[in-house]
Swiss-Prot record:
Its main location: membrane. GO terms for cellular component: endoplasmic reticulum membrane. The lineage of its organism: Eukaryota, Metazoa, Chordata, Craniata, Vertebrata. UDPGT is of major importance in the conjugation and subsequent elimination of potentially toxic xenobiotics and endogenous compounds. Glycans are attached at residues 177, 288. The chain crosses the membrane at residues 466-481. PROSITE patterns: UDPGT (PS00375). Gene3D superfamilies: Glycogen Phosphorylase B. This is UDP-glucuronosyltransferase 2C1. It comes from Oryctolagus cuniculus (Rabbit). Keywords: Endoplasmic reticulum, Glycoprotein, Glycosyltransferase, Lipid metabolism, Membrane, Microsome, Transferase, Transmembrane, Transmembrane helix. It is an enzyme of class 2 (transferase).
Length: 502
């Protein structure tokens, strides 16, 4: 398995642990350094990829991307957004190239991996190179991820049908019920991502993959060989859309029943009485906020009767109320599953959102970047959440959102409806993910699920050759009909006129 950081690793680790329980031997390729991954604590065989970069440099780059995505991009014109995205894409590609080089150029590592005779490779399509390693080892591979920006990888490399008229592009924050202007925005988002991905990222990686494999190929061709695509979503909060046989929703695979809280934490929760508690976290990637924003948030939290558990490692806000307690870490799943939890204030990360759905907890969303605006847009459309824009948020707007979610019973009812749908599945998400991985291992692939779209050129895929042929036929018929009419007109009409004159 090729590991990525943060939520990507959290989900992959759950799958790997289940596979290990079923008797499979696991080896994980881990870059060093990593921001969240500690390769000394990973309970599997580990191959560390040594990089010539420090953890501090990675954190600095991450903070720059987070700030730009959360606060700069929403204020820029679309052409400036395109420029910034190209800039971030190139930096992201540079980081991926470092990791890939450390694996591909390590002959001893590749020899060990070949000698191990693995049955399958689990990879993340956002971390280029997992599929290249699988190709070099001549083994099938399965992808696990949430989505790519604008669904560009799924559309271009997997052939996933994505009509822009009702399938909102990822990171757009749109729903499936779009106005004309929103459909225009969605169409332009797809176009912009196609241009950026094709012209500023793919060409470089096409050349790299061709050089490594010793034959002319493209990264999309190699990605398209994925046997299964395990997507961290599900129909409980996803909008209906076309799908492919080798795509499977496994959202919430990490969710589980709540465990009892530590004694001190349980005492704090019980002290809330009938008012209950609110759980607040902006995830593992946001370590702190500006003093102004943290005081604004603390002031709003101080005005609700509920007790608040706030995961926050920044400076203690001056406006922090007696009902609010700060924690460096909280047992989030166990708190969301507690009967006294009334609401969840979240950035909208997929993992936390699915834990809230699993336990039926309504949400106040403060989306920042990546998949978060999309996630919050979905649960908001389902009536289980309200959203607040961190850039323009005020104490009163956050307070109003909290009171609405806590006091309006419809939010809780809709959250419970999503929870019931999530639990009413023929197979649990984790079991479904493991089933398909083992299916690919048993059958050495799943090519019978692979659509023929991979074998078509782009103009064949859109039937443009058929359209051109039909238009040519119509034009030919019109041309011949016109010529025939002119011929008969000249042959008979002019002859008749000539006889009359005689």
């Amino acid at each position: 398995a090729a590991a990525m950081d943060f939520s990507h690793w959290i989900n992959l680790k759950v799958i790997l642990e289940e596979l290990q329980l079923r008797g499979h031997e696991i080896t994980v390729l881990v870059p060093s350094p990593s921001l969240l991954l500690d390769h000394t604590k990973i309970p599997f065989n580990v191959e560390v990829l040594q990089l010539q970069v420090t953890k501090e440099t990675l954190m600095e780059e991450l903070n720059t991307v987070l700030y730009m995505s959360s606060f700069e991009l929403p204020t820029l014109s679309w052409w400036k957004v395109l420029g910034k995205m190209v800039e971030m894409g190139k930096q992201f590609s540079k980081n991926l190239r470092r990791v890939c080089d450390s694996a591909i150029t390590n002959k001893e590592l590749l020899d060990r991996l070949k000698a191990a005779k693995f049955d399958i490779c689990l990879a993340d399509p956002l971390a280029f190179c997992g599929e290249l390693v699988a190709e070099l080892l001549n083994i099938p591979f399965v992808y696990s991820f949430r989505f790519s920006i604008g669904n560009i990888i799924e559309r271009s490399c997997a052939g996933l049908p994505t009509p822009s008229s009702y399938v909102p592009g990822s990171t757009s924050g749109l729903t499936d019920n779009m106005s004309f202007v929103q459909r225009l925005k969605n169409w332009l988002l797809y176009l912009m991502n196609d241009m950026m991905f094709s012209h500023f990222m793919l060409s470089e990686w096409d050349e790299y993959y061709s050089k490594v494999l010793g034959r002319r190929t493209t990264i999309c061709e190699i990605m398209g060989k994925a046997e299964m695509w395990l997507i961290r979503s599900y129909w409980d909060f996803e909008f209906p859309r076309p799908f492919l046989p080798n795509f499977e929703y496994v959202g919430g695979l990490h969710c589980k029943p709540a465990k009892p809280l530590p004694e001190e934490l349980e005492e704090f929760v019980q002290s809330s009485g009938n008012d209950g508690v609110v759980v607040f976290t902006l995830g593992s990637m946001i370590q702190n906020l500006t003093e102004e924003r943290s005081n604004l948030i603390a002031s709003a939290l101080a005005q609700i009767p509920q007790k608040v558990l706030w995961r926050y490692t920044g400076k203690k806000p001056a406006t922090l109320g007696p009902n609010t307690r700060l924690f460096e870490w909280i047992p989030q799943n166990d708190l969301l599953g507690h009967p006294k939890t009334r609401a969840f204030i979240t950035h909208g990360g997929t993992n936390g959102l699915y834990e809230a759905i699993y336990h039926g907890v309504p949400m106040v969303g403060i989306p920042l970047f990546g998949d978060q605006p999309d996630n919050i847009a979905r649960v908001k459309a389902k009536g289980a959440a309200v959203d607040v824009d961190l850039r323009i948020m005020t104490t009163s707007s956050l307070l109003k959102a909290l009171k609405d979610v806590i006091n309006n019973p419809s939010y809780k009812e809709n959250a419970m409806k999503l929870s019931r749908i999530h639990h009413d599945q023929p197979l649990k998400p984790l079991d479904r993910a493991v089933f398909w991985i083992e299916f690919v291992m048993r059958h050495k692939g799943a090519r019978h699920l692979r659509v023929a779209a991979h074998d078509l050129t782009w103009f064949q895929y859109y039937s443009l050759d058929v359209v051109v042929f039909l238009l040519t036929c119509v034009a030919t018929i019109i041309f011949l009909a016109k010529k025939c009419c002119l011929f008969f007109y000249r042959r008979f009409c002019k002859t008749g006129n000539k006889r009359k004159r005689e």
